[in-house]
Curated annotation (Swiss-Prot):
Pfam families according to UniProt: DEAD (PF00270), Helicase_C (PF00271)
Positions with a binding annotation for ATP: A82, Q83, T84, G85, S86, G87, K88, T89
UniProt-annotated location(s): Nucleus
Protein name: ATP-dependent rRNA helicase RRP3
Annotated signal peptide: none
Residue numbers covered by motif Q motif: 38-66
Compositionally biased region (Basic residues): 439-448, 468-484
Reaction equation(s) it catalyzes: ATP + H2O = ADP + phosphate + H(+)
């Protein structure tokens, strides 16, 4: 094994070559059951990293890991198609760490992620896998102090995990920072990156990094945009496809609940009460409803907490950690939380709002029934959502079953919910988070607070990097918001 360069040897541990270690002996908790009997050592992973896999509970490679790692170790570009929860992070991290171990240098690899939470999660897993070789990582995301991130960059990390917007800010504004020596580029959740309008920023990033590099692109689907990005950024890639169709696992019980739109909140309260022993995630389409419903549930005695892209980064991480640790059993979230995040032991997913496509549905309900465990999902379906429900059922190849409720019990909750809704609207107005009584008031609050009439929860890094918001036809005062 080659010796490290003088610059890196002082910061990256380099023990002598050990003997072959035994195969890891515990289970890989977040990847689906593999369809092979290979070990990480069989794939060519070094004993040091095999031990790291074992310490993290990875018994054997997942299918995406078994398919991608050998090609990556041969130095090939890879496009990997696999669903969330398939073990993609280790699939690209292990080959990078192994090559880094053999030739340590700063700014060795860059991983682009669509959301801040996913960026932190990737960094944590990379750090854990590379703990035995002293890997240094830095996370660059919006909502956090630029100066502290600049200090982290001055320590010359081996691997950077970033959202595209904040990375571009540092490339343009942080003195002495460049990626001219970069050896690896990873784009994780590429379809989500492009859905969030990061395409123009990624184009800029591709222009300032070396053309001679290894590139890994991982995506749940091969969309037209992803195919275009592949052609622009990868060189003769090997295509690794674990699943070509969106599907849900057999251990997930999928239900729908047909209800009138006007009573939606009462039905949600009924479910929260009847299933109160469950750890649950409630998905909303808008930031305002995530905030509003969490307030309503808290006022009625339920341990709920919101998670959406308009919260500060510290609040987002605090919400996520409280839910993961069991401090709160209900997380009311937008689609910021639907992909990639490792949230163990979610018993129930409730779709308060219908996802607009099958892809988002699969990602949402994929937060439960992970790693062979059972789980349940309930999708609230109003009279306006029936066609969307049928499309989703057709796409996933499964029929959902109707969830039975006591309609008389629901009716008894309407006055309680209406009062809590008024109190939530008042709290949101007083705290400056928008709101007003009823749907019209809530819509008005959303326009006032969240600005652009676009009710998708888009990560702030898009705006920070200068990409205009969709449907943003009017900005009060006509002034462009400065980057953070």
């Amino acid at each position: 094994m080659p010796s490290p360069s003088p610059e890196a040897s002082s910061s990256m541990s380099q023990p002598g070559p050990p003997s072959r270690s035994p195969s890891p002996a515990s289970s890989n908790p977040d990847a689906p059951e593999a369809s092979h009997n290979k070990t990480f050592a069989d794939l060519g992973i070094s004993p040091e990293l095999c031990r790291a896999c074992a310490s993290m509970g990875f018994k054997k490679p997942s299918d995406i890991q078994a398919e991608a790692i050998p090609h990556a170790l041969e130095g090939k570009d890879i496009i990997g198609l696999a669903q969330t929860g398939s073990g993609k992070t280790a699939a690209f991290s292990l080959p990078i760490l192994q090559t880094l171990w053999e030739n340590p240098q700063p700014f060795f690899a860059l991983v682009l992620a669509p959301t801040r939470e996913l960026a932190y999660q990737i960094s944590q897993q990379v750090t854990s896998l590379g703990s035995g070789i002293g890997v240094r990582t830095a996370v660059l995301v919006g909502g956090m102090d630029m100066m502290s991130q600049s200090i982290a960059l001055s320590k010359r990390p081996h691997i950077i995990v970033a959202t595209p917007g904040r990375l571009m800010d540092h490339l343009e504004n942080t003195k002495g920072f460049s990626l001219k020596s970069l050896k690896y580029l990873v784009m994780d959740e590429a379809d989500r990156l492009l859905d969030l309008d990061f395409g123009p920023i990624i184009d800029k990033i591709l222009k300032v990094i070396p053309k001679e590099r290894n590139t890994y692109l991982f995506s749940a689907t091969m969309t037209t945009k992803v195919a275009k990005l592949q052609r622009a950024s990868l060189n003769k890639p090997v295509r690794v496809e674990v699943s070509s169709k969106y599907s849900t696992v057999s251990t997930l019980l999928q239900h729908y609940l047909l209800l009138p739109l006007k009573n939606k909140d009462a039905y949600l309260l009924y479910l929260a009460n009847e299933l109160s022993s469950s750890s649950m995630m409630i998905f909303t389409r808008t930031v305002a409803d995530s905030q509003r419903l969490s307030i309503i549930l808290r006022r009625l005695g339920f341990p709920a907490i919101p998670l959406h892209g308009q919260m500060t980064q510290s609040l987002r991480l605090a919400s996520l950690n409280k839910f993961k640790s069991g401090g709160r059993s209900i997380l009311v979230a937008t689609d910021v939380a639907s992909r990639g995040l490792d949230i163990p032991l979610v018993d129930l997913v409730i779709n308060y709002d219908m996802p607009t496509n099958s892809k988002d549905y699969v990602h949402r309900v994929g937060r439960t029934a992970r790693a062979g465990r059972s789980g349940k999902s309930i999708t609230l379906v109003t009279q306006y959502d029936v066609e969307i429900l049928q499309r989703i059922e057709s796409h996933i190849g499964k029929k959902m079953t109707s969830f039975d409720v006591d309609k008389e019990a629901v009716a008894l909750l309407t006055d309680t919910v209406a009062k809590a809704n008024r109190e939530a609207a008042l709290e949101m107005r007083e705290s400056g988070t928008g709101g007003g009584g009823g749907k019209r008031g809530r819509d008005k609050g959303k326009r006032k607070t969240f600005g652009d009439g676009d009710d998708r929860d888009r990560d702030d890094d898009v705006v920070e990097a200068g990409v205009p918001r969709k449907k943003n036809k009017f900005t009060p005062g006509g002034k462009k918001k400065a980057r953070k």
